[in-house]
From Swiss-Prot:
Top-level lineage group: Viruses
Keywords from the UniProt entry: Activator, Host nucleus, Host-virus interaction, RNA-binding, Transcription, Transcription regulation
Subunit structure, interactors included: Binds to bovine CCNT1/cyclin-T1. Also binds human, equine and mouse CCNT1.
Protein name as catalogued: Protein Tat
Gene Ontology CC: host cell nucleolus
């Protein structure tokens, strides 16, 4: 299993801020193994716990799966009728077809 590691991210800054020197962020990963036991707290110490915590808690970036979306209506599902307007329309259509057959 992989042990703790340290990652440093260097970000360039404009010349006006901090004397034009790049800012480095240091991440300590104390999570051991593929399963991460990160704290659920969002305090400043826990949000800088590892790179994953920083992205999710500080920046709000979550690459995990979102909520499941429902699919579109399939052919087998019933469509609900509204009131009795549809029935009246069917009766009128059936009466028209009978009058056309008589002629």
């Amino acid at each position: 299993m992989p042990g703790p590691w340290v990652a440093m991210i260097m970000l360039p800054q404009p010349k006006e801020s901090f004397g034009g020197k790049p800012i480095g962020w240091l991440f300590w990963n104390t999570c051991k193994g593929p399963r991460r036991d990160c704290p659920h707290c969002c305090c400043p110490i826990c949000s800088w716990h590892c790179q994953l915590c920083f992205l999710q808690k500080n920046l709000g970036i979550n690459y995990g799966s979102g909520p499941r979306r429902r699919g579109t209506r399939g052919k087998g599902r019933r469509i609900r009728r509204t009131a009795s307007g549809g029935d009246q329309r069917r009766e009128a259509d059936s009466q028209r077809s009978f009058t056309n057959m008589d002629q």
